Regions:
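Extracytoplasmic/lumenal domain signature
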Residues: 1-7, 12-20, 24-69, 74-177
Length: 177
């Protein structure tokens, strides 16, 4: 026997607050919560972002297809990131629970359950995104091997990372205009 709303994703604790999610199917309800770690007092509950009517990545259909946690939640500054499987993580204001951003990926494009972040950048499915706006022109730093095999930080953009994924490895990393 299982609940209609099992705990999903990994719990994250920051500044004495526990953030967690429950629910699988948007039609049954998805719940993202923030509670005091010491008392369990509910600080906020977002139960609306799981029922967003939106275009689907296949065949031009629309459906209720909001946020469902499918990976460990991540706190970066005043943002809570909720990995959602195939899509880019949903972003919430961690102080209020206000839904800020979510977008389904087109078929065969990347999303992921594994998400990590630092500063104003988060990495999801091997791609780095600016936390304010997911923009292919966003400037980012990525760590990669140089021609002599040494790990180095490279200034680039999200779009160039995506472009380079399509190139044969023999061409190396193309970072110019």
């Amino acid at each position: 026997v299982i609940s209609r709303w099992p705990a999903r994703g990994g719990v994250v604790i920051s500044d004495g607050v526990v953030y967690w999610a429950a629910g699988i199917w948007q039609s049954e309800g998805i719940f993202i919560r923030a509670q005091r770690a010491d008392t369990g007092k509910l600080l906020w509950l977002n139960d609306k972002s799981g029922g967003i009517e939106m275009a689907q990545p296949h065949g031009g259909a629309t459906a209720k297809s909001g946020v469902t946690a499918q990976g460990h939640l991540v706190v970066i500054g005043n943002r809570l990131l909720v990995p959602t499987g195939r899509a880019v993580p949903a972003v919430f204001d961690r102080g209020t629970g206000q839904f800020l951003y979510y977008r389904l990926q087109q078929n065969t494009h990347r999303g992921a359950t594994a998400t990590m972040g630092h500063g104003d950048v988060f990495i999801n499915g091997g791609l780095a995104y600016d936390l304010g706006v997911v923009d292919p022109r966003a400037s980012i730093k990525v760590r990669m091997k140089s021609e002599n095999g040494v790990n180095v930080w490279v200034d680039t953009t999200v779009g160039r990372i995506i472009f380079n994924e399509a190139l044969p490895p023999v061409l190396g990393f193309r970072n110019g205009e």
